[in-house]
Amino acid sequence: MPRNYLFSSESVSEGHPDKMADQISDAILDALLAQDPLSRVACETMVSTGFCTIAGEITTKAVIDYQKIARETINAIGYTSADTMGYSGDTAAIFVALDKQSVDIAQGVNEGEGIDLDQGAGDQGIMFGYACTETDVLMPMPIYYAHRLMEKHAELRKSGELAWARPDAKSQVTVRYVDDKPVSVEAVVISSQHSPDVDHDTIEKEIIEKVIRAVIPAELLHEGTQYFINPTGRFVIGGPVGDAGVTGRKIIVDTYGGMGSHGGGAFSGKDPSKVDRSSAYMGRYVAKNIVAAGLAEKCEIQVAYAIGVSQPMSVMVDTFGTGKLDDEAITELVKKHFDLRPKAIVQQLDLLRPIYKKSAAYGHFGRELPEFTWERTDKAAALRADAGL
């Protein structure tokens, strides 16, 4: 009997307070890497009513204006008036509390130091990569459309077409699966911060017509699709005034929307020596190439590291019964075609560049921007040939 179920994923806008924090942390990371590609960065941001705090550990030769970067990032998102929006990059108090990277950690990461003379992992941990055939970019459908809805919302807000819209927003997409294949969108939830002078009917009509129907293909929608637009009825107070925001609190939004697994490590504000970020990007690259090669319809890879050690503790591939080869054989292909040591990951994906602010909203995966090397499928042909397909 065909398996019939619903699966939902959410996204948030660039104006959501947690995403604001992610973007500030990654804007700082980019500025540091632009001057000193070997910067060691662990930058955490918190935003709340009237202020922004930047903390963490940074070792760098770069000299940057942390406050200026934070203010510019906040204003670019759209928080430009404390009077009308409750928050502004121009008037928020910016606190900076930074230290250097621990020398104990550094000796395990610096090449030629510590017990393993190769560049070791910046921490222990488990990282996952995932890909599937549900969309052209090999991402799960629910998170893919949840992100696209938020991108469209921001586009129309900034152009003035949604004149009432303000930066804070969230989306959620529920997809029906039959035999593990997506067949329809059953529900869409969008909550958008708005000006106090617009009525709910206008918000509902414009979100459905200008955002949802512009993004989700008509063949996926049907008469029974449910739309929940600002279901509380009012969303005037938003952004950092409505909720405090902190770097690294949207890790499922950042990845696969709850489909597949997550090792728990956040991305934003971390330089590529942190395997939380670089190995998760590599995992996406590996999984996407396996699926692009036709070795499986769905693929998840887990990689584990120990701090200061270059070689992974373990590598595991799961194709959920969709593989053309058994999972053990695909795991061996991965070990043959991909070097999973931290320094090799940085080199293969060219990660010592100021490319991270773009990743900090609307998903780190599934957007085929030129800078996002982990979205390339340049290993697919070699994998397919080696598999004998």
UniProtKB/Swiss-Prot annotation:
EC supergroup of this enzyme: transferase
Binding site for K(+): 44
Binding residues annotated for ATP, in chain numbering: 16, 168-170, 234-235, 243, 249-250, 266, 270
Cofactor(s) of this protein: Mg(2+); K(+)
Free-text cofactor note: Binds 2 divalent ions per subunit.
Annotated spans, Flexible loop: 101-111
CDD domains: S-AdoMet_synt (cd18079)
Chain residues that bind L-methionine: 57, 101, 243, 274
Record: residues binding Mg(2+): 18
Organism domain of life: Bacteria
Enzyme Commission no: 2.5.1.6
Pathway where this protein functions: Amino-acid biosynthesis; S-adenosyl-L-methionine biosynthesis; S-adenosyl-L-methionine from L-methionine: step 1/1
Localisation per UniProt entry: Cytoplasm
GO-annotated biological processes: one-carbon metabolic process; S-adenosylmethionine biosynthetic process
Classification via Pfam families: S-AdoMet_synt_C, S-AdoMet_synt_M, S-AdoMet_synt_N
Reactions it catalyzes: L-methionine + ATP + H2O = S-adenosyl-L-methionine + phosphate + diphosphate
A GO MF label: methionine adenosyltransferase activity
Principal subcellular localization: cytoplasm
Any Gene Ontology CC annotation: cytoplasm
Keyword terms: ATP-binding, Cytoplasm, Magnesium, Metal-binding, Nucleotide-binding, One-carbon metabolism, Potassium, Transferase
NCBIfam families per UniProt: metK
Family in the record: Belongs to the AdoMet synthase family.
Assembly and binders: Homotetramer; dimer of dimers.
Function text: Catalyzes the formation of S-adenosylmethionine (AdoMet) from methionine and ATP. The overall synthetic reaction is composed of two sequential steps, AdoMet formation and the subsequent tripolyphosphate hydrolysis which occurs prior to release of AdoMet from the enzyme.
Name the record gives this protein: S-adenosylmethionine synthase
